[in-house]
Amino acid sequence: MLQSNEYFSGKVKSIGFSSSSTGRASVGVMVEGEYTFSTAEPEEMTVINGALNVLLPDATDWQVYEAGSVFNVPGHSEFHLQVAEPTSYLCRYL
């Protein structure tokens, strides 16, 4: 079953799903803006198209992740994103 999600007044939209090859995940798109997300469990983020400028928990420097890049976010934490162009992503819940 698919689950639609919308955040930040519609600037971030995702569709949640579960599959045998991916596990529980969501795929989505973010438009330009700055966002802060909280995690309940560890997440693996893959940038599909575009780029994300990311400040991970306990980090002091922002890091750019472009299409094909992967980064991990610990559970029960918060991370910050800067998005300069519409960017698509896959988020796997680990």
From Swiss-Prot:
GO terms for molecular function: guanosine phosphorylase activity; purine-nucleoside phosphorylase activity; thymidine phosphorylase activity; uridine phosphorylase activity. It catalyses: a purine D-ribonucleoside + phosphate = a purine nucleobase + alpha-D-ribose 1-phosphate; adenosine + phosphate = alpha-D-ribose 1-phosphate + adenine; cytidine + phosphate = cytosine + alpha-D-ribose 1-phosphate; guanosine + phosphate = alpha-D-ribose 1-phosphate + guanine. The keyword Electron transport does not apply. Pfam families: Ppnp. The keyword Glycosyltransferase applies. Its EC number is 2.4.2.1, 2.4.2.2. InterPro entries: Ppnp, RmlC-like_jellyroll, RmlC_Cupin_sf. GO terms for cellular component: cytosol. It comes from the Bacteria. Keywords: Glycosyltransferase, Transferase. Belongs to the nucleoside phosphorylase PpnP family. PANTHER family: PYRIMIDINE/PURINE NUCLEOSIDE PHOSPHORYLASE (PTHR36540), PYRIMIDINE_PURINE NUCLEOSIDE PHOSPHORYLASE (PTHR36540:SF1). Catalyzes the phosphorolysis of diverse nucleosides, yielding D-ribose 1-phosphate and the respective free bases. Can use uridine, adenosine, guanosine, cytidine, thymidine, inosine and xanthosine as substrates. Also catalyzes the reverse reactions. NCBIfam families: PRK10579.1 (NF007875). This is Pyrimidine/purine nucleoside phosphorylase. It comes from Shigella dysenteriae serotype 1 (strain Sd197). The gene is ppnP.
